[in-house]
């Protein structure tokens, strides 16, 4: 009987939960604000783990990249913590990546809202000059 989740999925989930607890408590850098661990993707051979993060209240990319640099410098320490807590023979090397999906989602949402507002200004019965020229 096949399993619902692969081992890498289970390890990803465990690492995500552990890092969400450990980073606020153990990484004491004043430049690092609140960190959200959005996802963890572990390779099939358990050698590498990409940790996708965002920072609460940070909207500009340079500050986010500074936070990513801090986390990547602390990745060795965090990796040893993961090894201790999860008792794994092979512990993935952690690579922190700034997750832009939430920002992209907000941009798309604002574009949709703008298009809806524009459609309300021009009901379907109205035709713009461009549409009228095409029918001549």
Swiss-Prot record:
Its main location: cytoplasm. GO terms for cellular component: cytosol. GO terms for biological process: maturation of SSU-rRNA. It is found in: Cytoplasm. Keywords: Cytoplasm, Ribosome biogenesis. InterPro entries: KH_dom-like_a/b, RbfA, RbfA_dom_sf, Ribosome-bd_factorA_CS. It comes from the Bacteria. One of its GO terms (molecular function) is ribosomal small subunit binding. PROSITE patterns: RBFA (PS01319). One of several proteins that assist in the late maturation steps of the functional core of the 30S ribosomal subunit. Associates with free 30S ribosomal subunits (but not with 30S subunits that are part of 70S ribosomes or polysomes). Required for efficient processing of 16S rRNA. May interact with the 5'-terminal helix region of 16S rRNA. Belongs to the RbfA family. This is Ribosome-binding factor A. The gene is rbfA.
């Amino acid at each position: 009987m096949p399993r619902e989740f692969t081992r890498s999925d289970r390890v990803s989930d465990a690492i995500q939960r552990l890092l969400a607890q450990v980073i606020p408590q153990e990484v004491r850098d004043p430049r690092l604000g609140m960190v959200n661990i959005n996802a963890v993707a572990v390779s099939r051979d358990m050698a590498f783990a990409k940790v996708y993060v965002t920072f609460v209240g940070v909207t500009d990319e340079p500050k986010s990249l500074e936070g990513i640099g801090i986390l990547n410098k602390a990745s060795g320490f965090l990796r040893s913590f993961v090894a201790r807590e999860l008792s794994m023979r092979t512990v993935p090397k952690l690579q922190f990546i700034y997750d832009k999906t939430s920002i992209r989602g907000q941009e798309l949402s604002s574009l949709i809202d703008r298009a809806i507002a524009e459609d309300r200004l021009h009901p379907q019965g109205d035709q713009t000059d461009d549409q009228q020229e095409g029918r001549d």
